[in-house]
Amino acid sequence: MLARFFFVLPSAALALASPPGHKLCPSQSGMPTKPTPVLPSNGGGHSELPEPSEDVSLKHIALGFGIQNYTCADTAASPTPVGALAVLYDVTHLYPGQGHSSLTQDEWASLPGDILDTLKVPLNLNEKGTGASLVKPFPKKRDLKIRSLSKKIPYLGHHYFNAAGVPTFDLDKARQLLVAKKIGDIKAPASSPAGPEGTGAVNWLFLGDAGGSHGISYAYRVLTAGGASHGCKAKGADSTSYTAMYWFYN
């Protein structure tokens, strides 16, 4: 179990039994080319997140890998979410049908859970497992190596909560920033990966611009794995490892 970590900087397996069909992008010749990535449907009996409006376009699909933070007032209380911390990796090219390195639909849907179950959280964790370093939580910026892929997944940025407690996505590799607010959320499908500690998957989210963003206006958190709290077994702070797919639009 990871102890809760709340970092302040100065300046958030799919039930894809039937994956959504691809949208084909017509080429200038009128012939279909690579499919346009389509947000996954929840398929778990819950209402869906709103679809992206027609006046925005997809900028990145990122894998977020880190921790969700909670606090408990006492053992009888419900855990209160108090932030998150994650490294973001650009997986747009891995979406099915995008190119020679693309994954199959099944591989894509299982990627967050597979990574969470097999790799170490890419943060500077304290030696005794009490969360991430308060001084330098993020390690050196580097791409993510996965045994099943011939090439590393490119680093894209960081996810954290700023000094005002606002969820922030700093895509510094692309020089883009989303200072976010929650517009909507739904429960993750029951079949979603529960994570290595079996806590369950955090909700899917739809996020918008809270002011101060540039290059990104909206984000979706989908295909979540792990990240739900351990419950209030004691008073204090707690953290749970998680992965998710973040779809960024502008």
Predicted regions and their residues:
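Primary mode marks residue(s) on the alpha4-beta5-alpha5 output face of response regulator receiver
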Residues: P20-I67, A76-N250
